[in-house]
């Protein structure tokens, strides 16, 4: 980008054209929004694991495990839960925006995904395997499961987003920052389309214990 001395580059208008969500309230942005408007709560008893003697046994837990028809079945087996949430939400947003992959320049489309915990649960699970059965039982695919950047990678790979791509990790602000950074990328003219948001899976024993310990 170039600009003459004393002038500023024109700022492009940026608009949101599609929204997706997978929440404790519902699978889908519209259903989640309607239930929120109706005063329903996404907080419920933890079901995916037994909290035992934990003093807190409720959480905002996503009950479902999204299927991943957008990626290879073998690859899907090694996608961390948080990344599954991100893929499902991204797919809904792309569909809601009416984006046809044949109709846009893939080098001008990118993604920004925020996550705080990333695939931490995958680390916990593989550590158990390592402790119980030794190094020989550690999956060679482990290194493609837990990293924070894998969620953003899977979205870019599934929907052929070959433009700017990044992973943001700034705790509870990460989703807002990812959307803000994507906004800036478009406004600066570095991309025409950005898929941006936040994906998190934090309702597992170690993470919950860290908040109540």
Describe the predicted segments one by one.
Residues 2-75, 97:
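ACP-dependent fatty acid/polyketide chain-elongation machinery
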Residues 2-11, 27, 37-43, 95-107, ...:
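Acyl-thioester C-C bond-transforming condensing/cleaving domain
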Residues 13, 74-77, 81, 108, ...:
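Basic side chains
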Residues 19, 114-116:
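Structured loops at beta-to-helix junctions and adjacent beta-edge loops in soluble globular domains
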Residues 48-99, 121, 148-162:
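A glycine- and small-residue-enriched flexible loop/hinge segment at structural boundaries
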């Amino acid at each position: 980008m170039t600009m003459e001395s004393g002038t500023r580059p024109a700022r492009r208008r940026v608009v949101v054209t599609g929204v997706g969500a997978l929440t404790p309230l519902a699978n889908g942005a519209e259903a989640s929004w309607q239930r929120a408007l109706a005063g329903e709560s996404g907080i419920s008893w933890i079901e995916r694991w037994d909290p035992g003697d934990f003093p807190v046994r409720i959480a905002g837990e996503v009950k479902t495990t999204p299927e991943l028809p957008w990626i290879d079945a073998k690859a899907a087996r090694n996608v961390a839960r948080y990344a599954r949430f991100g893929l499902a939400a991204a797919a809904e947003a792309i569909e809601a925006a009416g984006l046809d992959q044949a109709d846009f320049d893939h080098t001008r489309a990118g993604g920004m995904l925020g996550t705080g915990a990333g695939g931490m649960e995958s680390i916990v699970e593989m550590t158990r395997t390592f402790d119980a059965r030794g190094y020989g039982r550690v999956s060679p695919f482990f290194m493609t499961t837990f990293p924070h950047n894998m969620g953003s990678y899977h979205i870019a790979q599934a929907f052929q987003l070959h433009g700017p791509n990044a992973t943001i990790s700034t705790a509870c602000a990460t989703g807002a920052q990812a959307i803000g950074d994507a906004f800036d990328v478009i406004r600066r003219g570095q991309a025409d389309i950005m898929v941006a948001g936040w994906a998190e899976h934090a309702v597992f024993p170690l993470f919950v214990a860290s908040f109540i310990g």
